[in-house]
Amino acid sequence: MDADFLIIGGGIAGVSAAARMSELGGVIVLEAEDALAHHASGRSAALFEPRYGAPAVVGLSMASEAYFRSLPGVLSPRGLLLVGKAEGAEAFEHDLEVMAFDRISVEEARGIVPILNPETVTMVGYAGHAEDVDTDLLVQGFAREAKGRGAKSVTRARVTGIAKEGAGWRVSSSAGEFTARMLVNAAG
């Protein structure tokens, strides 16, 4: 076997998995493009709002918060507005409470986003705790961590075939053949 773990996809999911799995054994990341995080992971305007989303997402966000805060420069202040119409008051009130937003006036909100239409927007919440995520810094940090533990990244490795082979996997790619005990699909 070439590695314990073979990860297909070199975006944030694949590179962060490589960082963690490299603590447990040998890792190879296969990325189809010329560089890691070439697609959405490298271009996203990421928001860290740990109370937003489905319960599983909120749980993951809350569990990740201390780690994100330990990385200098990964998080920076942003703020987030939640806007609502009169007919959506019940859902708005629920979201305001669950996500711990502060209620602000429409006039205050227009001071932040002047194009808000006060004829349409009747309720506003503000979350000063919402932050930007420097995704490039985060991905590069995970990549350094994985590389520091011996993980290898292979770019220009478009996967062309996958086969279960004995107790592991064989992956064919434009960069050659790779084998591993475990296969992780982190491709976008």
Predicted regions and their residues:
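Glycine-rich Rossmann-fold phosphate-binding loop(s) that bind the pyrophosphate
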Residues: 9-11, 15, 32
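Glycine-rich FAD pyrophosphate-binding loop
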Residues: 22-41
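A short, glycine/Asx- and small/polar-enriched loop/turn
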Residues: 88, 113-121, 163-170, 178
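Short hydrophobic core segments
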Residues: 5-8, 30, 178-188
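Dinucleotide-binding Rossmann-like beta1-alpha1 core, especially the glycine-rich loop
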Residues: 45-115, 121-123
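Extreme N-terminal leader/targeting segments of oxidoreductases
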Residues: 1-5, 22-24
